[in-house]
Structure formats: structure tokens, C-alpha cells
Amino acid sequence: RQRQMCIRDSHMVMSKKVSPHVTNVVEVDVTRLVHWREKNKDAFFRREGVKLTYMPVITEAVAKALAAYPQVNVSVDGYNILFKKHINIGIAVSLNDGNLIVPVIHDADRLNLNGLALSINSLALKARNNKLTPDEISGGTFTITNYGTFKMLFGTPVINQPEVAILGVGSIEKKPVVKETPEGDVIAIRHKMYLSLSYDHRVVDGSLGGNFLHFIADYLERFTSE
């Protein structure tokens, strides 16, 4: 365990030294997504045998954002920027011994929500049972880390080198929000979540990072499974 933690820590230190990190944060209204999950989770479990979480939808949003902004789906090799032909999304999984591993969903943009849900569940189970193959932990082009699992609102995640960006997902909380109506402003209870995007400022500027993050936020706020 000591050896594994040293390797992970040195990788994170290297990332901070190599990449000038910038982190943007946006608050997202996911009320529609929460209602969709509540409506469909029981039927999904009966049909697929796995729990329906928010991660498949978030992963789908990221895959679509990477397709729309291919400048983020890159890696850095010395002074060269390498554009990736495939969208391979790594999802950080916390292990029982306190360590972390990032299994990768290859060609995530080619999977529908069912496929993403099954892939995420399968990779997480393999990770916790030490059954991942080398291919399942390599080739990632972007990473998602979900610290909302630990009731954290938001954070500033460290980029998984040699990628150039990482998305952090916070917990979903109910909040009172002012909503505009034809009759005037009213107070409504909405489900809110923070997303934080850390990116390598050598490659991704503020405009690109902001547009990429807002693409994901807008997709989640307007989510429909149809």
C-alpha cells in the first residue's frame, strides 16, 4: 500500500509541476435530471440489474462536449499537442484500501445511456475486485472524478497526465432559488450541483475552458433521454 500511494502522489506532484492548473466552477440546476432518475431507477434496475446513477448522464454530457470541443480531447507530448481520434473517458474509482484507480470507457461517445451505465458499473466492480485488465486502465483522453460521493460540494481536481483537463462532480443539494415567472419572482426549491473543470492553461485558455464547462452544464440542465 505504501508503494502504491507513493506512485500516485508522485504522479500528482508531477502534474502540478508540469501543467499550470486553472479551475473553473459552475453551479448547475439538475432538477430535471433528478426527477428523471427517480422516475426510471426502479424499472432500470429490474431491466439491467444495476443501479441507475447520475454518472452515465454526466459521462454522456462530457462525451458530447469533447466531440464539440476536440481541442480539449488532446494530450501533451513535450512541445507537441496530440489530437485524439477516440473519446476515452476515465472515471476515478475509490478502492476499499483508500487508494484510487481510473478505469477507462473506450469510445464513450458511441455508447447510449444504458451502455454507459453498464460499463461504469462493470469497471467499478472490476476495480474493487482487482480484476481490471491493462487495456481498461490505459488510453484515457479525459477524466471525471466524483467527490459528490463523499458529500463534497466542489473541489479543484488535479489533471491526470498527459491529459489536459479533468471534471470534478460535486454532491447534489436542495437549495432555495429565485425563479422568474409572469407574475413576478418566486422562491422555489431546486436541486443544485457544482461542476469544476481543471485544465492545463498551456493548451486550454479561459474561453475554451468556460465554453466546454458550460456545454456540459447546459446539457445536464436541459437533459432529456429522448
PLM-predicted stretches and their roles:
Residues 1-4, 9-226:
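C-terminal catalytic/motor cores of large multi-domain enzyme assemblies
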